[in-house]
Amino acid sequence: RFFDDNQSINTASGADTYGDNPRLYHGGDFAGVTAKLDYLQDLGVNTIWITPIVENVKGVAVTDEGKEDVPYNAAYHGYWASDFTKLNPTMGTTEEFKTMISEAHKRGMRIMVDIVVNHAGYGTESTFADMLRDKSVSEGDIKSWQSGLPDFATENADVRAKLVEWQTSWMRNYGVDYFRVDTVKHVDSTTWAALKNSTTEVNPSFKMIGEYYGAGYASNGSTLGSGQMDADLDFDFNDQATSFVSGNISSVEKFLSARNSALNNTYMTGQFLSSHDEDGFKAALMNGKKYTEDEATSAALVAATLQLTAKGIPVIYYGEEVGLSGLNNYPYQTNRYDMDFSKATKDNVTYQHYKNLLSIRNAYTDVFARGSRTVVASSDEEGYDVVSRSYGGTTLYVGMNIKDTAKEVKVPVSLAAGTEVKDLYSGATYTVGSDKTVAVTIPAAKDGGTVILTEVKKTKDPGKTDPTPEKVSATSITLDKKTAGKQQNDTKKAAPKSGDDNEAATYVCLLGLAMVAITAATYRKKRACN
């Protein structure tokens, strides 16, 4: 639901599949992503996660137990495949798909395609008859037809080989950069290892981030560090961010410290605040904790700082960067809103906050992606937290304030008295005192609640006092099927090919094409969407 550029294809899956109903197609397409690449690059993202691209079942059907109050469903989300070798015509043509990828690559950005290996769409039993398991046999997460969706017998070597061939063809033929892998816990580990091996044969730097529902750094079904997934989506982080902005700073820092120690380039998680499967961060605060909209907006700003300065792969859900948020109130899912680009303005504090933070993260990729994390000043009662992030001789001090008033804090630093430091977030400068502390003002949460301090290193040219960032790489965002400033670091470069990419990349969840969502509670009961 990101951007509708080619309106002529909106009803390509049937005249009754497009409309205002939240469970129909809303128009997002490949051409729409291409049209908004400059917006995404300006925001500071480097990887665009789009929903499944393959042809899905046409028309509409009541699939949710025939309940009268459930809207009709079209395969707008992309998870009801009918042909894994063809593009979904409601998303665009082959040429539009190629153009989207090539134009993204010109900007040093990557395209991450959502894929489904577990199942096909409703009504495709005859199409895939020789590939499906017996519906009458149900054995746990793997050997069962989740939500009645035709389930592939992936433990069969021939079936596995065909599925792997279908998925890797998008790499070989079109240059897709990454996969987001759906329903990881519902497929056997042998299949995931086979897919990983095949993608590596095509492109050694290819990465896969898995959706293993409920996964975190400590529990992920052994999918990480085992030759299956390069990363998993981090389902723990949202709860931790909520706890942080609620005042439980010390307990969250214990979690983040352990997480920071566990993550490495072959064992990575992608932290998100909102998604198509979850309530939006702001909406959840307003609904569950009864925050006002202003209070929720302020808290979301600090949560974004926590997310974008933490180790791992930040995943930004489309519209989150301009303040949009909704509930995963199945079957209506207000979290599956249409993108509103009119909110991306200089006056939008949330939008400017994201651009600022992404620019800083991009300029100090190694520090944030690999660096140590140490608490240097913190108080649950007073609502502030300052941590040092250090790597390769560079140290940044990240300060966050969850209160509605600015906070004066003396930050202990490992710098000599008299050293000048700069707040990368605001541009303010400070001097290290004789006690080796820096007295800083962390703004109120409503004003961003953030400071990021760095040493101002003297150079031969007195006009150049800012430290040179050790690496610059873009960041990322994900799109959804409807649709739906200027990045401070304008450096453009080809997509990195290093194996370390798994640590440096930032995926942003803007469900740009087809919409992919379902509530967490519903997820356990049914898999109608993903």
Task: Place the predicted regions along the sequence by residue.
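Solvent-exposed loop/turn segments at secondary-structure junctions
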Residues: 1-4, 54-57, 117-122, 184-187, ...
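Substrate-binding/active-site clefts of carbohydrate-active enzymes
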Residues: 1-174, 194-210, 217-220, 243
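Conserved, mostly hydrophobic/aromatic
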Residues: 40, 50, 84, 104, ...
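Active-site-proximal helices and loops of the catalytic beta/alpha 8
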Residues: 165-179, 183-272, 286-289, 295-297, ...
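Short strand-edge motifs at loop-to-beta-strand transitions and within beta-strands
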Residues: 438-440
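C-terminal low-complexity, Ser/Thr- and acidic/Pro-rich disordered "stalk" regions positioned immediately N-terminal
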Residues: 460-501
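A cross-kingdom C-terminal cell-surface attachment/processing module
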Residues: 503-526
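Cytoplasmic C-terminal tails of single-pass
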Residues: 528-530
